Protein backbone atom coordinates (compact mmCIF):
# COMPACT_ATOMS: atom_id res chain seq x y z
CA UNK A 1 0.00 0.00 0.00
CA UNK A 2 2.93 2.35 0.77
CA UNK A 3 6.56 1.93 -0.17
CA UNK A 4 8.79 4.93 0.48
CA UNK A 5 12.54 5.14 0.00
CA UNK A 6 14.84 7.92 1.13
CA UNK A 7 12.13 10.53 1.75
CA UNK A 8 13.81 13.77 2.73
CA UNK A 9 12.44 17.24 3.30
CA UNK A 10 14.62 20.29 3.80
CA UNK A 11 13.39 23.75 4.75
CA UNK A 12 15.38 26.95 4.40
CA UNK A 13 14.96 29.44 7.21
CA UNK A 14 16.84 32.72 6.78
CA UNK A 15 20.50 31.75 6.68
CA UNK A 16 20.19 28.17 7.83
CA UNK A 17 18.83 24.95 6.40
CA UNK A 18 16.69 22.59 8.48
CA UNK A 19 16.33 18.95 7.49
CA UNK A 20 12.94 18.03 8.96
CA UNK A 21 12.87 14.51 7.49
CA UNK A 22 16.09 12.66 6.77
CA UNK A 23 15.95 9.66 4.47
CA UNK A 24 12.82 7.87 5.67
CA UNK A 25 12.28 4.33 4.35
CA UNK A 26 9.00 2.61 5.15
CA UNK A 27 6.62 -0.05 3.89
CA UNK A 28 2.94 -0.41 4.79
CA UNK A 29 0.98 -3.50 3.73
CA UNK A 30 -2.67 -3.67 2.69
CA UNK A 31 -5.03 -3.79 5.66
CA UNK A 32 -2.51 -2.67 8.28
CA UNK A 33 -3.01 -0.07 10.95
CA UNK A 34 0.40 1.53 11.39
CA UNK A 35 1.47 4.38 13.63
CA UNK A 36 4.12 7.08 13.46
CA UNK A 37 5.01 7.65 17.12
CA UNK A 38 7.21 10.53 18.20
CA UNK A 39 7.42 13.89 19.96
CA UNK A 40 6.62 17.33 18.64
CA UNK A 41 9.05 18.25 15.87
CA UNK A 42 10.07 14.65 15.16
CA UNK A 43 9.03 14.85 11.51
CA UNK A 44 5.76 12.91 11.77
CA UNK A 45 3.46 15.46 10.16
CA UNK A 46 6.05 16.49 7.56
CA UNK A 47 6.36 12.86 6.46
CA UNK A 48 2.60 12.47 6.36
CA UNK A 49 2.19 15.64 4.30
CA UNK A 50 4.72 14.33 1.79
CA UNK A 51 2.92 10.99 1.51
CA UNK A 52 -0.39 12.79 0.96
CA UNK A 53 1.09 15.03 -1.81
CA UNK A 54 0.64 18.22 0.22
CA UNK A 55 4.40 18.71 0.47
CA UNK A 56 6.86 17.74 -2.23
CA UNK A 57 9.87 15.74 -1.00
CA UNK A 58 13.27 17.36 -1.40
CA UNK A 59 14.49 13.90 -2.41
CA UNK A 60 13.34 10.30 -2.29
CA UNK A 61 10.55 8.31 -3.91
CA UNK A 62 7.31 6.66 -2.85
CA UNK A 63 4.50 4.53 -4.22
CA UNK A 64 1.25 5.28 -2.41
CA UNK A 65 -1.89 3.20 -3.06
CA UNK A 66 -0.38 1.99 -6.32
CA UNK A 67 0.48 5.46 -7.67
CA UNK A 68 3.83 7.22 -7.98
CA UNK A 69 3.98 10.08 -5.49
CA UNK A 70 6.19 12.29 -7.66
CA UNK A 71 5.05 11.37 -11.16
CA UNK A 72 1.31 11.13 -10.57
CA UNK A 73 0.25 12.98 -7.39
CA UNK A 74 -3.29 13.38 -8.72
CA UNK A 75 -3.73 9.60 -8.78
CA UNK A 76 -2.46 9.44 -5.20
CA UNK A 77 -4.98 12.07 -4.09
CA UNK A 78 -7.85 10.15 -5.66
CA UNK A 79 -6.88 6.96 -3.84
CA UNK A 80 -6.27 8.24 -0.33
CA UNK A 81 -8.17 9.91 2.46
CA UNK A 82 -6.50 12.53 4.64
CA UNK A 83 -7.67 13.77 8.03
CA UNK A 84 -5.31 16.50 9.31
CA UNK A 85 -4.78 17.52 12.90
CA UNK A 86 -7.82 18.86 14.69
CA UNK A 87 -7.74 22.28 16.30
CA UNK A 88 -9.89 21.19 19.25
CA UNK A 89 -12.36 24.07 19.19
CA UNK A 90 -14.32 25.58 16.33
CA UNK A 91 -12.73 28.83 15.16
CA UNK A 92 -15.53 30.06 12.98
CA UNK A 93 -15.76 30.07 9.20
CA UNK A 94 -18.06 28.94 6.41
CA UNK A 95 -17.87 25.23 7.26
CA UNK A 96 -18.96 25.87 10.84
CA UNK A 97 -22.23 27.31 9.57
CA UNK A 98 -22.93 24.34 7.28
CA UNK A 99 -25.01 21.34 8.19
CA UNK A 100 -23.17 18.06 8.71
CA UNK A 101 -24.92 16.53 5.71
CA UNK A 102 -23.98 19.54 3.56
CA UNK A 103 -20.31 19.08 4.45
CA UNK A 104 -20.46 15.44 3.40
CA UNK A 105 -22.27 16.16 0.14
CA UNK A 106 -19.94 19.06 -0.71
CA UNK A 107 -16.95 16.80 -0.15
CA UNK A 108 -18.46 14.19 -2.45
CA UNK A 109 -19.04 16.86 -5.09
CA UNK A 110 -15.37 17.86 -4.86
CA UNK A 111 -14.55 14.29 -5.86
CA UNK A 112 -17.12 14.46 -8.68
CA UNK A 113 -19.39 11.83 -7.21
CA UNK A 114 -22.91 12.08 -8.60
CA UNK A 115 -25.62 13.31 -6.27
CA UNK A 116 -27.50 10.05 -5.77
CA UNK A 117 -24.31 8.15 -4.95
CA UNK A 118 -23.16 11.00 -2.70
CA UNK A 119 -26.39 10.82 -0.71
CA UNK A 120 -25.98 7.04 -0.36
CA UNK A 121 -22.38 7.31 0.81
CA UNK A 122 -23.17 10.13 3.22
CA UNK A 123 -25.93 8.08 4.83
CA UNK A 124 -23.59 5.11 5.13
CA UNK A 125 -20.85 7.19 6.77
CA UNK A 126 -23.30 8.85 9.15
CA UNK A 127 -24.26 5.39 10.37
CA UNK A 128 -20.73 3.94 10.46
CA UNK A 129 -19.21 6.86 12.35
CA UNK A 130 -22.00 7.21 14.88
CA UNK A 131 -23.28 10.51 13.51
CA UNK A 132 -26.91 9.38 13.33
CA UNK A 133 -29.21 12.22 14.36
CA UNK A 134 -26.49 14.81 13.81
CA UNK A 135 -26.67 15.16 10.04
CA UNK A 136 -29.05 18.14 10.21
CA UNK A 137 -27.03 20.00 12.82
CA UNK A 138 -24.59 22.82 12.20
CA UNK A 139 -20.95 21.78 12.36
CA UNK A 140 -20.25 24.43 15.01
CA UNK A 141 -22.68 22.73 17.42
CA UNK A 142 -20.79 19.42 17.44
CA UNK A 143 -18.69 18.27 20.36
CA UNK A 144 -14.98 17.65 19.85
CA UNK A 145 -15.48 13.92 19.38
CA UNK A 146 -18.43 14.39 17.02
CA UNK A 147 -16.53 16.90 14.93
CA UNK A 148 -13.53 14.59 14.72
CA UNK A 149 -15.76 11.75 13.48
CA UNK A 150 -17.17 14.10 10.85
CA UNK A 151 -13.64 14.93 9.72
CA UNK A 152 -12.89 11.24 9.32
CA UNK A 153 -16.14 10.78 7.39
CA UNK A 154 -15.06 13.57 5.03
CA UNK A 155 -11.83 11.71 4.40
CA UNK A 156 -13.76 8.55 3.51
CA UNK A 157 -16.45 9.93 1.20
CA UNK A 158 -14.64 8.77 -1.94
CA UNK A 159 -14.03 5.30 -0.43
CA UNK A 160 -10.21 5.33 -0.46
CA UNK A 161 -8.33 2.10 0.28
CA UNK A 162 -5.87 4.09 2.42
CA UNK A 163 -6.55 6.82 4.96
CA UNK A 164 -4.05 9.06 6.77
CA UNK A 165 -5.02 10.30 10.24
CA UNK A 166 -2.83 13.02 11.75
CA UNK A 167 -3.10 12.97 15.56
CA UNK A 168 -6.69 11.65 15.41
CA UNK A 169 -7.49 11.99 19.13
CA UNK A 170 -5.58 15.12 20.15
CA UNK A 171 -7.80 17.34 22.29
CA UNK A 172 -10.41 14.67 23.01
CA UNK A 173 -11.43 13.61 26.50
CA UNK A 174 -10.61 10.01 27.57
CA UNK A 175 -14.07 8.65 26.76
CA UNK A 176 -14.09 10.28 23.32
CA UNK A 177 -10.57 8.95 22.67
CA UNK A 178 -11.66 5.41 23.51
CA UNK A 179 -14.71 5.80 21.29
CA UNK A 180 -12.53 7.07 18.44
CA UNK A 181 -10.25 4.04 18.77
CA UNK A 182 -13.25 1.79 18.16
CA UNK A 183 -14.14 3.72 15.02
CA UNK A 184 -10.57 3.51 13.74
CA UNK A 185 -10.54 -0.26 14.29
CA UNK A 186 -13.85 -0.46 12.42
CA UNK A 187 -12.33 1.26 9.38
CA UNK A 188 -10.30 -1.87 8.81
CA UNK A 189 -12.76 -4.44 10.14
CA UNK A 190 -15.80 -3.14 8.24
CA UNK A 191 -14.31 -1.36 5.23
CA UNK A 192 -10.93 -3.06 4.77
CA UNK A 193 -9.24 0.34 4.93
CA UNK A 194 -5.50 0.61 5.51
CA UNK A 195 -4.84 3.20 8.23
CA UNK A 196 -1.68 5.30 8.65
CA UNK A 197 -1.82 7.47 11.75
CA UNK A 198 0.54 9.80 13.57
CA UNK A 199 0.35 10.07 17.33
CA UNK A 200 2.28 11.16 20.39
CA UNK A 201 0.09 9.05 22.68
CA UNK A 202 1.87 5.88 23.82
CA UNK A 203 -1.33 4.07 24.77
CA UNK A 204 -2.88 4.90 21.41
CA UNK A 205 -0.03 3.38 19.44
CA UNK A 206 -0.04 0.34 21.72
CA UNK A 207 -3.79 -0.21 21.52
CA UNK A 208 -4.38 0.43 17.81
CA UNK A 209 -1.32 -0.31 15.73
CA UNK A 210 -0.19 -3.54 14.13
CA UNK A 211 3.20 -1.91 13.68
CA UNK A 212 4.77 1.25 15.04
CA UNK A 213 7.45 3.46 13.52
CA UNK A 214 9.29 5.36 16.27
CA UNK A 215 10.37 8.70 14.82
CA UNK A 216 12.83 11.21 16.25
CA UNK A 217 14.75 14.09 14.68
CA UNK A 218 13.47 13.24 11.21
CA UNK A 219 14.58 9.60 11.15
CA UNK A 220 12.93 6.28 11.96
CA UNK A 221 14.69 5.05 15.08
CA UNK A 222 12.94 1.67 15.17
CA UNK A 223 9.98 -0.22 13.76
CA UNK A 224 8.04 -3.31 14.77
CA UNK A 225 4.91 -4.47 16.53
CA UNK A 226 4.42 -2.91 19.96
CA UNK A 227 5.44 -6.20 21.57
CA UNK A 228 8.53 -6.54 19.37
CA UNK A 229 9.63 -3.03 20.25
CA UNK A 230 9.15 -3.63 23.96
CA UNK A 231 11.24 -6.78 23.76
CA UNK A 232 14.13 -4.64 22.52
CA UNK A 233 14.27 -3.11 25.99
CA UNK A 234 16.10 -5.02 28.72
CA UNK A 235 13.11 -7.20 29.61
CA UNK A 236 10.28 -7.64 32.09
CA UNK A 237 10.98 -6.73 35.70
CA UNK A 238 10.05 -8.95 38.66
CA UNK A 239 10.17 -7.21 42.03
CA UNK A 240 9.86 -9.26 45.20
CA UNK A 241 10.39 -9.22 48.96
CA UNK A 242 11.13 -12.32 51.01
CA UNK A 243 10.67 -13.00 54.69
CA UNK A 244 14.06 -12.60 56.35
CA UNK A 245 16.19 -14.36 53.73
CA UNK A 246 17.04 -11.65 51.23
CA UNK A 247 20.69 -12.60 50.79
CA UNK A 248 19.91 -16.31 50.41
CA UNK A 249 17.23 -15.50 47.84
CA UNK A 250 19.63 -13.23 45.97
CA UNK A 251 22.30 -15.92 45.74
CA UNK A 252 19.80 -18.56 44.66
CA UNK A 253 18.08 -16.43 42.02
CA UNK A 254 21.37 -15.14 40.61
CA UNK A 255 22.16 -18.71 39.58
CA UNK A 256 19.03 -19.04 37.44
CA UNK A 257 19.73 -18.78 33.68
CA UNK A 258 16.46 -16.94 33.05
CA UNK A 259 17.60 -14.02 35.24
CA UNK A 260 19.44 -11.45 33.13
CA UNK A 261 20.00 -8.81 35.80
CA UNK A 262 19.52 -8.77 39.57
CA UNK A 263 19.83 -5.99 42.12
CA UNK A 264 18.91 -5.52 45.77
CA UNK A 265 17.82 -2.27 47.40
CA UNK A 266 16.12 -1.85 50.78
CA UNK A 267 15.56 -5.61 51.10
CA UNK A 268 13.76 -5.63 47.75
CA UNK A 269 15.01 -7.86 44.94
CA UNK A 270 14.64 -6.58 41.39
CA UNK A 271 15.12 -9.11 38.59
CA UNK A 272 15.14 -8.54 34.85
CA UNK A 273 13.87 -11.53 32.85
CA UNK A 274 13.03 -12.14 29.18
CA UNK A 275 9.42 -13.31 29.46
CA UNK A 276 7.89 -12.33 32.77
CA UNK A 277 4.77 -14.49 32.65
CA UNK A 278 6.82 -17.62 31.94
CA UNK A 279 9.64 -16.76 34.33
CA UNK A 280 7.49 -15.90 37.34
CA UNK A 281 6.29 -19.44 38.20
CA UNK A 282 9.83 -20.78 37.69
CA UNK A 283 11.22 -18.27 40.18
CA UNK A 284 8.47 -19.04 42.66
CA UNK A 285 9.22 -22.76 42.50
CA UNK A 286 12.93 -22.13 43.05
CA UNK A 287 12.28 -20.08 46.18
CA UNK A 288 9.63 -22.46 47.48
CA UNK A 289 11.99 -25.40 47.01
CA UNK A 290 14.52 -23.64 49.22
CA UNK A 291 11.92 -22.92 51.88
CA UNK A 292 11.98 -19.17 51.25
CA UNK A 293 8.62 -17.43 51.56
CA UNK A 294 7.67 -14.11 50.01
CA UNK A 295 5.84 -11.12 51.42
CA UNK A 296 5.32 -9.26 48.13
CA UNK A 297 5.81 -9.79 44.40
CA UNK A 298 5.04 -7.79 41.26
CA UNK A 299 5.65 -8.00 37.52
CA UNK A 300 6.03 -4.98 35.23
CA UNK A 301 6.62 -4.82 31.50
CA UNK A 302 8.42 -2.23 29.40
CA UNK A 303 6.28 0.46 27.82
CA UNK A 304 6.73 2.18 24.48
CA UNK A 305 8.06 5.12 26.47
CA UNK A 306 10.77 2.80 27.83
CA UNK A 307 11.56 1.88 24.22
CA UNK A 308 11.77 5.55 23.24
CA UNK A 309 13.96 6.28 26.25
CA UNK A 310 16.30 3.41 25.34
CA UNK A 311 16.56 4.53 21.72
CA UNK A 312 16.88 8.28 22.24
CA UNK A 313 18.06 8.77 25.80
CA UNK A 314 14.99 10.72 26.85
CA UNK A 315 11.32 10.19 27.59
CA UNK A 316 8.70 10.91 24.98
CA UNK A 317 7.71 14.50 25.64
CA UNK A 318 4.28 15.92 25.10
CA UNK A 319 3.34 16.97 21.61
CA UNK A 320 1.44 20.11 20.70
CA UNK A 321 -1.49 19.95 18.29
CA UNK A 322 -1.14 21.81 15.05
CA UNK A 323 -3.31 24.60 13.80
CA UNK A 324 -5.55 24.94 10.82
CA UNK A 325 -9.13 23.96 10.10
CA UNK A 326 -9.20 20.18 9.66
CA UNK A 327 -12.49 20.22 7.79
CA UNK A 328 -11.15 22.83 5.41
CA UNK A 329 -7.88 20.96 4.91
CA UNK A 330 -9.70 17.76 4.01
CA UNK A 331 -11.68 19.71 1.44
CA UNK A 332 -8.43 21.23 0.18
CA UNK A 333 -7.09 17.77 -0.61
CA UNK A 334 -10.30 16.82 -2.37
CA UNK A 335 -10.20 20.04 -4.35
CA UNK A 336 -6.60 19.42 -5.31
CA UNK A 337 -7.50 15.96 -6.51
CA UNK A 338 -10.53 17.07 -8.48
CA UNK A 339 -9.42 20.48 -9.62
CA UNK A 340 -7.30 19.49 -12.60
CA UNK A 341 -10.21 18.54 -14.79
CA UNK A 342 -9.29 14.86 -14.90
CA UNK A 343 -11.97 12.27 -14.37
CA UNK A 344 -11.63 8.90 -12.74
Please give the residue ranges for each predicted region.
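An acidic, carboxylate-rich microenvironment
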Residues: 75, 102, 117, 228, ...
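Surface-exposed charge patches
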Residues: 106, 124, 251, 285, ...
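ABC transporter nucleotide-binding domain
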Residues: 182-274, 298
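A generic structural signal for secondary-structure junctions
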Residues: 81, 112, 130, 234, ...
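C-terminal coupling/interaction segments
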Residues: 275-344
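Residues that cap or initiate secondary-structure elements
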Residues: 15, 32-34, 158, 246-248, ...
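ABC transporter nucleotide-binding domains
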Residues: 2, 9-216, 221-222
Amino acid sequence: MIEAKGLTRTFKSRKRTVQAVRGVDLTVDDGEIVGFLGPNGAGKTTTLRMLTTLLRPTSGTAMVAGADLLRDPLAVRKRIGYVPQAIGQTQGGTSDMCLVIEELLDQAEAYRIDRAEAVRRAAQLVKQLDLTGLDQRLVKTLSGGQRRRLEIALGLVHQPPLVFLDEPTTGLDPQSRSNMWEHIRALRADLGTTVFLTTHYLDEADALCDRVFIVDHGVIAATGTPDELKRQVSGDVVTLRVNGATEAARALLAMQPIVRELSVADEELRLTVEHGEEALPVLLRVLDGAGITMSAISLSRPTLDDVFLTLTGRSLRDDSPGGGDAVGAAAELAGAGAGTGSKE
